[in-house]
Amino acid sequence: MPRSATLVIDAQIGSMGGAYEGSSVIKAINKTISKVRESSGVVVFIQHCHSSYEPLMKDNTGWGLHLDLDKSPEALVVEKESSDSFYETPLDDLMAENDVEHVYITGIQTEYCVDTTSRVALSKGYSVTLVSDGHTTGDSHILAQAVIDHHNKVLANLAHPKSRIRVAPSDEL
């Protein structure tokens, strides 16, 4: 029977520190995790391994998953080095092994790993929901809220011959 998965992208101690509305986003991620678990889905925590950015170097304190995430022993963990959570990782194989057809995308950073993973998941044939209140970024030359709003709109309107990315808040999943 087809299942769903929550992908929690890079919600690590070192990346969530300066995140816009970080605690609210963690709550939305946990809500999404709970919904997927209730329907016998799977949860995948994806951790970015960075070779030169110390907070995300493997096994540093900042590399660990955010302490407020609803983790459980049965959750899957994937390590990546790219903005694409599927690139040279076992993620696609794990999805196949668990009969996953639908993915809920959450995490950080909206304009990098969240965006890229959403697009790649769609191209790989998954049904994709971007949790609109479950992803974030930090302020840069563009305010974080503007980046989030922009990506929610762009990804919802992305052209694809077989499917679209659904964008919905955690309360409407």
Language-model regions, residue ranges each:
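Active-site-adjacent betaalpha module
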Residues: P2-A5, K27, K31-S34, L56-L173
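Generic enzyme active-site microenvironment
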Residues: L7-V8, F45-I46, V131
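Short, glycine/acidic-enriched capping/hinge loops at junctions between secondary-structure elements
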Residues: G18-A19, P55-M57
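A short alpha/beta connector and helix-capping loop motif
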Residues: Y20-C49
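Glycine-rich, proline-tolerant flexible connector loops at the mouths of alpha/beta enzymes
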Residues: H50-E54
